[in-house]
From Swiss-Prot:
InterPro entries: Sugar_transport (IPR010651). Keywords: Cell membrane, Membrane, Sugar transport, Transmembrane, Transmembrane helix, Transport. The chain crosses the membrane at residues 2-24, 34-56, 63-82, 92-114, 121-140, 150-172, 179-198, 218-235, 242-264, 274-293. Pfam families: Sugar_transport. CDD domains: ribose_uptake_RbsU. This is Putative ribose uptake protein RbsU. Could be involved in the uptake of ribose.
Length: 294
């Protein structure tokens, strides 16, 4: 693995790490955030498809990738809602941990990964450590009933959202879709859900299609799409491969968490900062272990 490949592998870290921070900085309601994000992703996906001359996949693959993108958008809407109550710095480590656990369990029970007893022991130990890490990142010194209720509600919502993120990964695998071929259909699926959600949220005092934040968030969509695109490149066997590419991309949670604390000014006590950093370390290290178990 050379320096160029590692640099490519770290590009998703920058894109996915900065994406939630930009969304938080621009602001807006979840409908505006998902509209802008999906519009930005679709624009870049069209540019990439034209530039590469990527052929449109056959009907079944196109539909599965479209559903994949729709699943992501549904999950992301939930995540945007949780940002409002828990903040980026608490939400991102939790959703990253859930995605790592979800991907691992999908691999074990559906794809037949971790076939040996030793692999299962190591893998499920790693999952337990991820769960502990998630708990630490969500921990707060505020013991009020309102704070506890908000945290529990946020975590439960993110668990539901994990089904969408799992669908985002699983549907392309079901048809063995090439990453670049699936990129545009996924972006179309994301945008369809974004538009439908925007229409359902349109009211007399709030019209997401006329909100400035909806179009400012196109910029955040470019960062998400950049990360998704560079991840496709990184995951190719000739670059970093799927396992290494996945682990490198998940380091984006460091950017997002630190950005939430220092750029979005999400306050943490000294004890909470220690808990967050230890939790992040557990999520990243244990997540790396799950990616390399055979």
């Amino acid at each position: 693995m050379n320096a160029v490949n590692i640099l490519i592998g770290l590009m998703p870290m920058i894109g996915w790490g900065i994406f939630p921070v930009i969304v938080g900085k621009i602001g807006g309601k979840p409908a505006s955030q998902i509209l802008g994000t999906t519009f930005g992703t679709l624009i870049l996906a069209i540019v990439v498809a034209i530039f590469r001359g990527t052929p449109i996949p056959e009907t079944k693959t196109f539909i599965f990738c479209l559903i994949s993108g729709a699943c992501w958008a549904l999950a992301q809407i939930i995540t945007f809602h949780v940002f409002e109550t828990m903040g980026v710095s608490r939400t991102m480590p939790i959703t990253t941990g859930f995605q790592l656990v979800g991907a691992s369990l999908w691999g074990v029970f559906v794809l037949g990964n971790w076939s040996s007893s030793q692999s299962k022991l190591i893998g499920f130990t790693a999952i337990a450590l991820i769960i502990i890490g998630v708990y630490l990142t969500a921990w707060s010194e505020d013991k009020s009933s309102a704070s506890k209720s908000g945290a529990v509600k946020g975590i439960l919502l993110l668990l539901v959202g994990e089904l969408g993120y799992l669908g985002y990964s699983a549907f392309p695998q079901a048809v063995s879709a090439d990453g670049f071929q699936g990129f545009l259909p996924q972006a179309i699926g994301m945008t369809i859900v974004g538009i439908i959600f925007g229409l359902t949220q349109t009211k007399k005092d709030y019209k997401p299609f006329k909100e400035a934040t909806s179009y400012k968030n196109i910029f955040s969509g470019f960062f998400f799409a950049f990360a998704a695109l560079t991840y496709l490149i990184s995951a190719q066997p000739s670059v970093n491969g799927l396992a290494t590419g996945f682990v490198l991309s998940q380091t984006s949670v460091i950017f997002a968490t630190i950005g939430g604390i220092y750029i979005l000014k999400e306050k943490k006590s000294k004890k909470e900062m220690i808990a967050v950093m230890v939790g992040l370390l557990l999520v990243l290290v244990a997540g790396s272990v799950t990616a390399f178990i055979k």
